Swiss-Prot record:
As a component of the minor spliceosome, involved in the splicing of U12-type introns in pre-mRNAs. Its main location: cytoplasm. GO terms for molecular function: microtubule binding; PDZ domain binding. It comes from Ictalurus punctatus (Channel catfish). Keywords: Cytoplasm, mRNA processing, mRNA splicing, Spliceosome. It is found in: Cytoplasm. This is Cysteine-rich PDZ-binding protein. The gene is cript. Belongs to the CRIPT family. GO terms for biological process: cytoplasmic microtubule organization; mRNA processing; RNA splicing. Component of the minor spliceosome, which splices U12-type introns.
Length: 101
């Protein structure tokens, strides 16, 4: 669950919008080279799944969060009715029987 304010912070789709002129995410000038090995040409190390990549732990259950910039996991955010990114109350769960199965 994410509030309206935090929806703007969510990531964008990686695919290029080639059908739109002046799209932000196109690689027309100096994009990725063809047949380029990114592991050899990149300046920093390759993908490190266990390294610090912006993912933190949930403030309630201490499990890993699967969305960068979030403070709560989706299960806890659903149970409490709060935004996963900022913790703002999104849903009144007073009369609900919330379960995360």
């Amino acid at each position: 669950m994410v509030c309206e304010k935090c929806e703007k912070k969510l990531g964008r789709v990686i695919t290029p919008d080639t059908w739109k002129d002046g799209a932000r995410n196109t690689t027309e000038s100096g994009g990725r080279k063809i047949n380029e090995n990114k592991m050899l040409t990149s300046k920093k190390a390759g993908f490190d799944p266990y390294g610090k990549s912006g993912f933190s732990t949930c403030r309630i259950c201490k499990s890993s969060v699967h969305q960068s910039g979030s403070h709560y996991c989706q299960g806890c955010a659903y149970k409490k009715g709060i935004c996963a990114m900022c913790g703002k109350k999104v849903l009144d769960t007073k009369n609900y029987k919330q379960t995360s199965v």
